Every structure is written in C-alpha cells, then in structure tokens.
A protein has these predicted regions:
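Short, flexible helix-loop junctions that flank or precede catalytic/ligand sites
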Residues: 1-315
C-alpha cells in the first residue's frame, strides 16, 4: 500500500498547483514547528494526488477545505510573483480538543471552564497558528459536555467535527458558511434556534461583529476567535469593526457583554496565556469601566492582577 499524507506530521503543507515542484511542510512535532522542511521523496506520489484533488476542488476559488485520504485541510491558494500557483493546506484535527490536555495551568483552565455557566462574550485571541481555534473549540466541547444545551457553530470551513451529542444534555449543530453567504446572515439565522452557546469561527464583517455583540448581550454565551498581537488589540479590533455597522456606543455594548478574553501564544513548552474576565452582574467591574471609558490601553495592569489572583486565591 502506498504511503499517504496522513502519515506526514504536518501542521501546514505547501504544494505547488500549476506544475510538480518540491513540497514543503511545517511539522507538528515539538521543537520543529517553527521551521519549514522539505517533504520527503517517499511522499511524492501522495503530494501529486493531493495537487490534483486540490485543483479539482478549488477550481477558480482561492479558499476552501478538502477531505483527502483521511486528512481534512483548510486551503488557501495564492498566485506568486513568478506566476506560479501554490496552496497552503492547514491540517484540521478531527479529534475534539480536551481542555485538560492542552497544557494550560490548572488554575487558569478551571476558571475558563467555569465561564460556561455564564452568558456574554468570550474572545480567544492571538496570532495565526497559535492555537486559538483549538482552545475555543475545547471550551465549547467542555461546556456542552458538562452544562448541556444546544450550540450552533458558524465556520468557514468547519475545523473540528463537533456536530452531534456531547455528554447527556449537549448537542452541537455546525454551519459552514457558503461562499456567497454573509456571516451576519448566518449568525442572525442561528439566533432563531435559541442556542445556549454560539461559536463563530472568525468575525470578518462589520455586520457580523454587530450581530455577535447583540447575541452576547441577549442571554447567549458567544465564543469567537480574533487575530491580534495583544489582548488590547483584540478588543480594539472588534470595536473598530463593530463601529462601522453600529456607530458610536459600541464600547458600552462590549463592556456589558464581555465575559472573558484569552490571549494565547504557543511556545515550545505549551501555551502561554494572558487572561482576563469580568465579574457577573457587576456594572462597576474595572475591566468594563476601562472599555466604556475607552482606556483599553491601561488593561495590562489588570491582566497581571488577575494572573496573581488566580495563582494564589487565598493570598
């Protein structure tokens, strides 16, 4: 039996599409994730089959997903300066993340798990490739398993197979946004299902940001991921996007709706977390006040205080 791509330990796979060329990959093996390596020659036939499948699947599109020989990938195609065409295939793990096995300090993981009892908005932020989606999905799966209720996810593409039963009382419905659809329309439609939890893979439009904030302040617990270089940047980016649809006053809505913010950096030893949360039923919470007063840049002080408080709850 010929070797398949499922045996290559890749996170990202780079394959030329217009003609055969040397493929490269970024390994998921510890200590090797920061370098690109040449795909070994014994995988060439598998790479050739993958190239054909991607060309057939994407056609004129630049983004999409593929199930290929036991591997599910998110695809992003680019035309290069020399007119060559390449695709980056991000491997999608079909195993649902377990919050107890993601490498978080126990006191932080336990507090994040408890957020599932609340409503509001949980932002999971960080740079590309630092595990935002894994953490967000791990939280949602934990909430469903332990607290029950219905969840609707809105993704492009679906990255983990969450659909179906979770524990005794949890059920997840997964929606993959079609290319011609708007994220805001899918989110608005999801609200009619009266879900306990909503997971939005990424906020891409002002209207979607508006719907997300509306959902977070009307009894749902909403989880989403945000590309950002810092916790403050994550909040300011969401405000900037939502203001284009909602106008002034977004800070007040975000302040009322924010439940938790996770900023994640993946290191060789595991995830490094900056974490903040608001107190329930506390309009005077200092985090909410900073957001309302547009003083988000001062939030780092509270992140440090929260870290110390969780690490030493009796101190």
């Amino acid at each position: 039996m010929s070797i398949t791509l499922s045996e290559l330990p890749f996170i990202d796979l780079y394959v030329r599409l217009d003609q055969p060329d040397q493929a490269l990959y970024r390994s998921k093996e510890r200590g090797k994730s920061h370098i690109n390596q040449l795909v070994p020659p014994e995988y060439q036939l598998a790479v050739d089959r993958f190239m054909s499948a991607v060309n057939e699947g994407l056609k004129e599109n630049n983004d999409g997903s593929i199930d290929f020989e036991g591997v599910r990938c998110r695809l992003s195609k680019q035309k290069m300066s020399d007119n060559s065409s390449w695709v980056c295939a991000r491997r999608i793990n079909t195993v649902i993340p377990d919050m107890d096995k993601l490498g978080f300090a126990k006191h932080i993981a336990d507090h994040m798990k408890a957020l599932g009892k609340r409503d509001g908005l949980i932002l999971v932020s960080g740079a590309t490739g630092h595990g935002k989606t894994t953490t967000a999905v791990g939280l949602l799966a934990y909430f469903l398993r332990n607290y029950g209720g219905a969840a609707v996810t809105i993704e492009d593409p679906v990255e983990f197979m969450l659909k179906g039963r979770h524990g005794e009382g949890g059920h997840c419905f997964q929606v993959e946004v079609r290319q011609e659809e708007d994220w805001a329309v899918c989110l608005k439609r999801a609200l009619r299902w009266a879900p306990r939890y909503i997971y939005v893979g990424e906020i891409r439009t002002p209207k979607a940001a508006e719907q997300l904030l509306r959902a977070a302040t009307t009894g749902h617990l909403v989880i989403t991921t945000v590309h950002a270089g810092s916790p403050e940047e994550a909040l300011m980016g969401l405000i900037f996007l939502a203001e284009q649809a909602m106008g002034p006053g977004v800070q007040n809505i975000l302040a009322a709706g924010l439940t938790g913010l996770i900023y994640q950096t993946m290191k060789e030893t595991g995830p490094h977390i900056k974490y903040l949360f608001t107190e329930p039923d506390s309009p005077g919470d200092p985090i909410r006040s900073l957001i309302r007063e547009n003083k988000i840049g001062m939030m780092s002080t509270y992140i440090d205080r929260i870290a110390a408080r969780l690490a030493n709850p009796s101190g």
